[in-house]
Amino acid sequence: MKYDFTSIEKKWQTRWQAEATFATGTDHSKPKYYVLDMFPYPSGSGLHVGHLEGYTASDIIARYKRSSGYNVLHPMGWDAFGLPAEQFAIKTGTHPRITTEANVKNFKGTLQAMGFSYDWEREINTTDSGYFKWTQWIFLQLYDRGLAYMSEVDVNWCEELKTVLANEEVDEKLADGYTVVRRPLRQWVLKITAYAERLLADLEELDWPENVKQMQRNWIGRSEGVEIDFELRCHRTTLKAYTTRPDTLFGATYLVIAPEHPMAEKLATAPQLLVVKEYITKAKLKSDLERTGLQKEKSGVFTGSYAINPATGQPLPIWISDFVLISYGTGAIMSVPAHDSRDWAFAKQYNLPIIEVIKSPHDVQEAVFEEKNSTCVNSANDEISLNGLDFATAFERMATWLESKKVGKRKVNYKLRDWIFSRQRYWGEPIPIKHYEDGTIRPETNLPLELPAVEAYHPTSTGESPLANITEWLIGNDEHGAFRRETNTMPQWAGSCWYYLRFIDPHNHAQVVDGNNERYWMNVDLYIGGAEHAVLHLLYSRFWHKVLYDLGVVSTKEPFQKLFNQGMILGEDNEKMSKSRGNVIPADHVLQRYGADAVRLYEMFLGPLEQVKPWNTNGIEGISRFLGKVWRFVYPEHSEAATQPSNEPLPDELLRRMHKTIKKVGDDTSSLKFNTAIAEMMVFVNELTKTGCNNREAIETLLKLLAPYAPHMTEELWEALGHTNSISHEPFPTFNPALVEENMAIIAVQVNGKLRGTFTVPAKSPKEMLLEEARKVESVAKFLEGKTIVKEIVVPDKLVNFAVK
């Protein structure tokens, strides 16, 4: 009988659903394992083969852990609010909910066709009112704790999309060709900076890829420095500037402030006022990325004012430049051009002094010297000398001196900025806030606050969302008086900040999550998804989780204990899959042609899970042939009936081979080395085929090992062998350590440390036998002839070394 994957896969998917095979266990006395995918945004284009990689990996682990005795939580849902659905609604007039429901149905169909063992009873959708009720509730907890506030801020405004972009979203939109400018707008902002230190410190407790942790460290951007008060000439005040290099203060030759600095226009002298105003106006139209790009030519304007360097007493010209951001430090910096590349380029461009204060191997007039591993020079006055000191010592001495003079203080700063949370669009969670005529603000008490129906989805010309046009929803009265509802909506990130918690208790109408269930399941043991979410989603989720921890809602400090980033699967042209390149391989196409088990195995066999690798259709043919070999153990060629294997004992060599396979597949599966686990199973299949083995123990063991990878075929063959239970409920095979040990050892023989030959002996042979056999090796004997052996070194099962003279 030929393997008909179409009917067999449908049969088992239907049965799994009917029998709730993958329902989450409720026995809290068992060990638990929570394996989670980064849930998808259900786009109209559907899933391609690259999307399936991470889902397949998580499913293999979920199945493996179930068979290893764990209660497994393996859920799926939909991050369904977002801009693409709204843009489609603007274009077609179709309500976003309609397109979202169609897209979800398409996505779910593909995931079910892959045989993923999700507990679909726990399915969630961020656009369901029963879900976003709790998203709104969490927002109000942030508001009550002073972590959500309104502010008139300069935002990243995308003219084409008519909405605000978070700082973290700007790069992507610019790369896509959108225009991003800065403009002031009333915004809701979340005070993520209040958690900066904890977000940074707790990274050390996480089993995450080091590059992802480093990206978060860089984004948080903690630095230790000194805030220095520079006395202004002709002004009865000071200008504060933050620096991480107080050791270079003697080399500061000018100051630079951000165009948005509150003193920018005040510092402009009469002759400079016009050019200063023009420069400030132009700077405000640029995004932060445009302003701070390392390759851009530095621009600036002199204010006409000066400050005094407290170490030298020399006047420092004060400039305005857009490479300084008001959001970092004080919005003012001291510039030491000899030892900072940006300052050096600016000084050269505007002919400003360059003074060496760190001993440099070259002329700092010709090139900057930025290394810290040198000593201070030209750094002394009547009260303090840094000359000859290293960085750390000079830092401390200067910081102490500045504090003693009351012109500076030590300070920790962060690059992290508060999260601009509101969006000027329709398809997002309404922010549950009422604005009253007397100026007070009160939260909505009756959650969820749902979106009203609208006829047009375009943002208003003033930048408000379409909700501003729905008067019957917008305006109301209650016991506190007349009010106007908040028209901004939440960003797409809101729903994904806490979804992992809702999966634990998705049908709870009384609270976000039941405490007992949360304490059992949290935190997530394995979180699989793309590295592109390193800063955005992961940082935001960690922030919300820490707030919920402080509220007593959750019991863990962090949501995701282990993070794994799968590598991208490229198109067959070795390029990233995209519609514009025409190299997208739709998942449904390969499923129809090869079946789910072949696709699952092939994606995992392509290479290490974390590596980028190209799709190759020829490769999946080889996987299909491998599955055919497995099929023929039970359904030989030209046979319509299943053959029942023999119960005769396995030959010793095959028995050892089987136990080694069990160990290797188990070890590699648990460490996500799926490609080598599959390779080991292929070797075992070839051994069984070559020897004509028809042993029940060997074949059933193979099926149990293969079941997490190819669940449909293994279920079918398991049933054909006479079993009535699902193979998904079978324990994963265990190996006998005595049968796994190597019974032969290859011994390397060295003479004076150089390899001269090898020989093979039974493992654990005594030292005397190893020395005797080593001397007999022909290629070794000639190097011993006529020599005196002064020392013999033996490493059991590995090495013999003769020291001769």
Swiss-Prot record:
Reactions catalysed according to its record: tRNA(Leu) + L-leucine + ATP = L-leucyl-tRNA(Leu) + AMP + diphosphate
Pfam families noted in UniProt: Anticodon_1 (PF08264), tRNA-synt_1 (PF00133), tRNA-synt_1_2 (PF13603), tRNA-synt_1g (PF09334)
Keyword line: Aminoacyl-tRNA synthetase, ATP-binding, Cytoplasm, Ligase, Nucleotide-binding, Protein biosynthesis
GO biological process: leucyl-tRNA aminoacylation
Residue interval(s) of motif 'KMSKS' region: 576-580
Ribonucleoprotein keyword on record: no
Taxonomic superkingdom: Bacteria
Motif stretch ('HIGH' region): 40-51
Name of this protein: Leucine--tRNA ligase
Organism from which the protein derives: Chlorobium chlorochromatii (strain CaD3)
Gene from which this protein is expressed: leuS
